[in-house]
Amino acid sequence: MADWVGPCSAGRKARRSRASRDVAGTKQTSALNQEDASQRKAELEAAVRKKIEFERKALHIVEQLLEENISEEFLRECGKFITPAHYSDVVDERSIIKLCGYPLCQNKLGIVPKQKYKISTKTNKVYDITERKCFCSNFCYKASKFFEAQIPKSPVWIREEERHPDFQLLQDGQSGPSGEEIQLCSKAIKTSDIDSPGHFEKHYESSSSSSHSDSSSDNEQDFVSSILPGNRPNATRPQLHEKSIMKKKAGQKVNSQHESKEQTVVDVIEQLGNCRLDNQEKATACELPLQNVNTQISSNSSLQKKLEASEISDIKYSSSKVTLVGISKKSAEHFKRKFAKSNQVSGSASSSLQVCPEIAKANLLKALKETLIEWKTEETLRFLYGQNYASVCLKSSSTPLVKEEELDEDDMNSDPDSHSPALQELNSLDESLPFRASDTAIKPLPSYENLKKETETLNLRIREFYRGRYVLNEETTKSQDSEEHDPTFPLIDSSSQNQIRKRIVLEKLNKVLPGLLGPLQITLGDIYTQLKNLVHTFRLTNRNIIHKPAEWTLIALVLLSILTSTLGIQKLSQENVMFTQFMTTLLEELHLKNEDLESLTIIFRTSC
């Protein structure tokens, strides 16, 4: 028993010692882990502090670059501690405070354009000027971009171990672009592209390339005539396919029998080439051979078409420098597609002819007269001249009416047809007849049977009425007053089209009136009430309120002229020298005369 207890106690002691050693090791490892964690935490905090310090330094540099009088050496040193994002912030902040975005430039920004793109007529290119608007000149824009491209893109807190770049600054005298170029066309069209458009098919025939490739046949290799501008001494000739060469050989065998007739066509073409000169004698000498040849080849329509085509091509393109080149149908279609836009632009430029100033002036006055006549109503005349507007309008319009009547009588008397004996006999015959012919349609006569039945019915009704047996049916008549109608309310101002049109007219007049009233030292408030009341009497439609600014200026002049008596302002009277000079100067700028303005104002002096 004692022997058994001894080993057990020894084993317990060994286990206890092992457990104590494990606990001690665990404490040591935990202590080491805590030390590592604290060390890593300290390193992380140091890295964060370093990062924050470099960022703070970069922001401080950005603030310093917003000031004036920046030297080149300071700018080179600043490039080592900032990123391109920091530099773009410098450019934006300087433009906000109306300074040039380039730190070395001390100029102030002037009027900044609002548009995003600019078309350069010097280089024929389109530029995006979003960034260019932050600089005072193209040189500053290019110099800023040149310096920004050298700034490293790596973070500022890891540049201690890197080698700092040697910054270079753009020297004066080197102009830059107007902005970022917009690529409207990937590649310019060349003459070689017309004959070999294979590499362009991906851009223009992406959807239909498969169908065209499947349906391509020998017809694509058939050659058609096409005109290319300019001479082509070094132009590449279109490469012929083997099938087209075989066709050409076969066509030569078939057309050998027509060589004699084609020879006459060649002779005629040579004679036409001689007729290109402006000498009239040579032209007359060529007329007789042409007539003979036309009679010879009248039997062959194909040769006649060739002759006509050659004549048209020789005569039409003799003055211009063009070259007749044979290209395939596929190339011809590609040629048309390439130059479709240019042809449209040239066609629109040639069609826009300059209109004669007199014609433009007449059209302007005609349109304004029609507008003012449509605007004028009886309420307008009553507002201008009072209740007795009829007498005032008749006096002012009596003389032109008499002239028109006299002109009509003279025209009637001077009509040559009225003196013809045939017309006189017809007029006398019409006067002798008890009735005259009318232009109305004549109704067809009723049938005899219907008339007979109606007569018998009428006689029967008369006899029955006198005997007292006939009773008339009471006709139920409904008065128009008894008809019930649903009451309708007038439209409110926000939905009334007439009110909206009046508001539009007043807005247009308010835009042009300050420019007219300013030189006369009259405020808009002096005439606005009367002008508004006058506009409310007009008959406005959706068509007679659409005018150009120059037309609205003339309309405002006319309305000011007719409101002179109503307003009672002496500055608007014709006796005022200042008003007269102002009107004369304004009409000269509009290429009009006082008579033209008078012809517009007289519309409101005549009755409706």
From Swiss-Prot:
Give the residue ranges for region: Disordered.
Answer: 1-38, 193-262, 403-423
Q: Please state the Enzyme Commission number of this protein.
A: 3.1.3.16
Residues recorded with modification Phosphoserine: S9, S216, S432, S479
**Acidic residues bias (residue ranges):** 405-414
A GO biological process held by the record = PERK-mediated unfolded protein response
Coiled-coil region: 33-68
UniProt cross-references to InterPro entries, sorted A to Z: Rtr1/RPAP2, Rtr1/RPAP2_dom, Rtr1/RPAP2_sf
Modification type N-acetylalanine: residues? A2
Protein location: Cytoplasm; Nucleus
**Molecular function as annotated in GO:** protein serine/threonine phosphatase activity; RNA polymerase core enzyme binding; RNA polymerase II CTD heptapeptide repeat phosphatase activity; zinc ion binding
Q: Name the major location.
A: cytoplasm
- What family does the entry list? Belongs to the RPAP2 family.
Could you give the subunit structure recorded for this chain?
Associates with the RNA polymerase II complex. Interacts with transcribing RNA polymerase II phosphorylated on 'Ser-7' on CTD.
* Annotated function: Protein phosphatase that displays CTD phosphatase activity and regulates transcription of snRNA genes. Recognizes and binds phosphorylated 'Ser-7' of the C-terminal heptapeptide repeat domain (CTD) of the largest RNA polymerase II subunit POLR2A, and mediates dephosphorylation of 'Ser-5' of the CTD, thereby promoting transcription of snRNA genes. Downstream of EIF2AK3/PERK, dephosphorylates ERN1, a sensor for the endoplasmic reticulum unfolded protein response (UPR), to abort failed ER-stress adaptation and trigger apoptosis.
Basic and acidic residues bias: where?
Answer: 193-205
Q: Where is the composition biased (Low complexity)?
A: 206-218
| Catalyzed reactions per annotation | O-phospho-L-seryl-[protein] + H2O = L-seryl-[protein] + phosphate; O-phospho-L-threonyl-[protein] + H2O = L-threonyl-[protein] + phosphate
Where on this chain does Zn(2+) bind? C100, C105, C136, C140
Q: Where are the zinc fingers (RTR1-type)?
A: 77-160
Keywords for the protein's UniProt record, in alphabetical order: Acetylation, Coiled coil, Cytoplasm, Hydrolase, Metal-binding, Nucleus, Phosphoprotein, Protein phosphatase, Transcription, Transcription regulation, Zinc, Zinc-finger
The protein depicted here goes by the name Putative RNA polymerase II subunit B1 CTD phosphatase RPAP2
EC category? hydrolase
| UniProt cross-references to Gene3D superfamilies, sorted A to Z | 1.25.40.820
Compositionally biased, Polar residues: which spans? Answer: 26-36
* A GO CC term attached to the entry: nucleus
